[in-house]
Amino acid sequence: MAKMMHSRLPDRITLLGAFCTSIFLYGTASAQSDGSTDRGAYIAVTSDCVACHTAPGGKPFSGGLAMKTPLGTMYSTNITPSRTFGIGDYSEADFSRAVRKGIRKDGRNLYPAMPYTAYSYMTDQDVHDLYVYFMKSVQSVESAPSKTSLPFPMNIRGSMMFWNVLFRNDRTFQPDPSRSSEWNRGAYLAQGPAHCGTCHTPRGFLMQEKSSKDLGGASLGAWYAPNITSDKISGIGNWSRENIKTYLKTGHID
């Protein structure tokens, strides 16, 4: 299984290593450290913002990454604090609405390639700190990435309003009081900022995640996001904590 997963791994080991570091080395203590900018940097790594919002050879968060989907090719946006090409003119309320509801400052809908259905779980504090980080610590990039141009009728962004009615989740994460604080922290990260299900859950014909097959593995164009459920045969149920840590850092386990 490890070899199969390794053979289909995209060339983003460095990003996965940073992600692993954020979860296993920084941990909850770092997430609760003082300073919105430091916490925002932690949330940005946990949310893997740079992976989609940075094109190969491009500047961090400047957008332009081409994402091929069954609906057409989408390009990620510039999310640096540029007031002309990025999100520099976004208020915190504008930012929160884009991140958690998929609605831009101008009122137009984002496509669910942006995982706002997962980010809706994020706490107000995490969104606040993420906003502070982008506005104060990210370098502004004064350039516009390629624009997404999808065929009719998906080029009508207003159609996303109906999709959102059916599939958008507007609830923040609710801890399970019967579980440990460690379990709840892991559930929050997996379901919210880390948005594991965005890649590892198969999608229906309307491109919605199939909740009945949550984290069961999904095809993503030229590569495959494997089953990461607790199933001991097809999933990672037999993996130890160290196995998971090693895989996230290196892309394989022995």
Report residues per predicted region.
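N-terminal secretory signal peptides that target proteins for export/translocation
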Residues: 1-11
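Detector for the c-type heme attachment site
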Residues: 52-58, 100-101, 135-136, 199-205, ...
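Bacterial N-terminal signal peptides
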Residues: 14-26
